[in-house]
């Protein structure tokens, strides 16, 4: 459960510089300057090595330990959420005589306090472990005996499955067991305990930041047996576990940024990997920049091309699909029937994003590339062959960062024996050799022409066919 990591040694360098060494008739002087620099030691917790949600990393020199988060307690090697009670009692007599307070009891490091605490904790363990609460009892701890009153303060823990569980132990049951334990211990020690001073009440985890794991910018609310956290109203809740909100609160974006529905700041509004905004969990960007619900494995929809006001475009996208819609080679054309818009089986689905050309080529033959997500799909090779002469097509979304989004998918044409180029994200496959290439928009003078993938492949296939005929 608890792990240790030996990290890099502290770098300590000595620079020995002979700044002056000369001899003359009167004196001989050797000046030696030593400059020592010590590099900052690496943070062993920087990589977030504690992956279990109930733990957090605690640096220990060049190593680290994974300890239970505040509000969790270690039991049998696991960190468990505990229902906590605060108990107290007063001792009035010892050996039949009234109590004279011992200053040693105020010192939690003293032998007197350690002895009394151990006796009381053992008695509580014996009673609770013999009760109906044995399965969930975690332990007790004597916190102190304040000088102003011979009154012990205790902490009693009961396990729950998670912080949202209802109260499993009420204070009445806990008090009865507590009273029984103290009575037995009082008889063994020859002390008298004032029953009217025995209390067991819900522990307030919000009283100290050490007892809860709420974000510093969240409001902690004590509940029966637990606590809840809620981010301040002006902050966004970015907690990794949706069932435990208020653990990570981030600042909102500057006004005017990340304003689309279901869109939030990424990393608290700081730019990292050129992605300032992101969709909330369960949503993803569409080709129009909207955050729509992500696809389910059964969601798919083919494309149908039809005339539009500005030009012939492909539409009919499913809500969870994203990318750049390509132009259609013909005024109307139905999509290739065996291609589906789903992440499994035939067809593929992509994520929004562009990468530069060098990165694109490095990832051409990878089944998964970030930010592209794709899978191979089945297709019919031209001329009626059952299989293509090359390997299966791996469709990745690659494009040049220098081209606008609407031309993004037409950069870096790549094909294998007439099969679709790697960065063609459109699931539609059309091998019609009579496509109307004039349906695409003409580029501005001096710019590179980017043809639709089917048009490019038609030229390739036509050229190959012409060569074969000759």
Swiss-Prot record:
GO terms for molecular function: calcium ion binding. GO terms for cellular component: motile cilium; plasma membrane; side of membrane. It is found in: Cell projection, Cilium, Flagellum membrane. Gene3D superfamilies: Laminin, SEA domain. Glycans are attached at residues 78, 170, 219, 322. Keywords: Cell membrane, Cell projection, Cilium, Disulfide bond, EGF-like domain, Flagellum, Glycoprotein, GPI-anchor, Lipoprotein, Membrane, Repeat, Signal. A lipid is attached at residue 446 (GPI-anchor amidated glycine). Residues 1-25 form the signal peptide. Residues 447-470 form a propeptide. Residues 81-205 form the SEA domain. CDD domains: EGF_CA (cd00054). InterPro entries: EGF-like_Ca-bd_dom, EGF-like_dom, EGF-type_Asp/Asn_hydroxyl_site, EGF_Ca-bd_CS, Growth_fac_rcpt_cys_sf, NOTCH1_EGF-like, SEA_dom, SEA_dom_sf. Coiled coil: none annotated. Residues 41-80, 202-250, 249-292 form the EGF-like domain. The keyword Lipoprotein applies. It is a lipid-anchor; GPI-anchor. Its main location: membrane. Disulfide bonds join 45-57, 50-66, 68-79, 206-220, 214-229, 231-249, 253-265, 258-277, 279-291. Sperm. The keyword NADP does not apply. This is 63 kDa sperm flagellar membrane protein. It comes from Strongylocentrotus purpuratus (Purple sea urchin).
């Amino acid at each position: 459960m608890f792990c240790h990591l030996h990290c890099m040694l502290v770098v300590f360098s000595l620079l020995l510089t002979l700044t002056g060494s000369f001899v003359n008739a009167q004196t001989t002087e050797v000046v030696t300057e030593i400059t020592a620099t010590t590099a900052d030691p690496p943070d062993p917790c920087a990589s977030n090595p504690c992956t279990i949600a109930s733990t957090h990393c605690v640096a220990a020199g060049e190593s680290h330990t994974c300890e239970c988060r505040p509000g969790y307690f270690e039991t049998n090697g696991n960190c468990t959420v505990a229902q906590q009670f605060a108990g107290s009692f007063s001792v009035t007599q010892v050996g039949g005589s009234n109590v004279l307070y011992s200053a040693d009891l105020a010192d939690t490091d003293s032998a007197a306090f350690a002895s009394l605490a151990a006796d009381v904790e053992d008695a509580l363990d014996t009673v609770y472990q013999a009760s109906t609460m044995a399965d969930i009892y975690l332990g007790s701890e004597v916190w102190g005996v304040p000088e102003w009153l011979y009154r012990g303060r205790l902490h009693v823990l009961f396990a729950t499955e998670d912080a949202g569980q209802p109260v499993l132990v009420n204070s009445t049951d806990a008090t009865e067991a507590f009273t029984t334990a103290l009575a037995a211990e009082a008889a063994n020690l020859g002390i008298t305990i004032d029953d009217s001073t025995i209390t067991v009440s819900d522990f307030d985890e919000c009283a100290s930041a050490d007892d809860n794991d709420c974000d510093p910018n969240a409001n902690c609310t004590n509940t029966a047996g637990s606590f809840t956290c809620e981010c301040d109203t002006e902050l966004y809740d970015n907690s990794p576990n949706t069932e435990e909100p208020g653990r990570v609160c981030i600042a909102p974006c500057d006004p005017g940024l990340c304003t689309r529905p279901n869109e939030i700041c990424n990393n608290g509004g700081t730019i990292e990997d050129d992605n300032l905004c992101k969709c909330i969990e369960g949503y993803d960007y569409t080709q129009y920049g909207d955050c729509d619900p992500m696809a389910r494995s059964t969601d798919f929809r083919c494309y149908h091309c039809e005339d539009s006001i500005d030009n012939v475009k492909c539409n009919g996208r499913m809500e969870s699909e994203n990318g750049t819609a390509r132009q259609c080679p013909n005024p109307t054309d139905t999509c290739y029937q065996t291609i589906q818009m789903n992440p499994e089986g035939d067809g593929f689905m992509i994520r929004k994003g562009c990468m530069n050309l060098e990165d694109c080529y490095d990832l051409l033959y990878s089944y998964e590339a970030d930010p592209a997500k794709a899978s191979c799909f089945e297709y019919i090779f031209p001329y009626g062959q059952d299989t293509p002469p090359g390997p299966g097509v791996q469709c990745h979304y690659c494009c040049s960062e220098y081209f606008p989004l609407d031309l993004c998918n037409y950069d870096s044409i790549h094909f294998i024996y007439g099969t679709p180029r790697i960065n063609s994200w459109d699931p539609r496959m059309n091998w019609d050799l009579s496509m109307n290439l004039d349906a695409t928009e003409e580029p501005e003078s001096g710019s590179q022409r980017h043809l639709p993938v089917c048009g490019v492949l038609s030229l390739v296939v036509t050229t190959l066919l012409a060569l074969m005929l000759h």
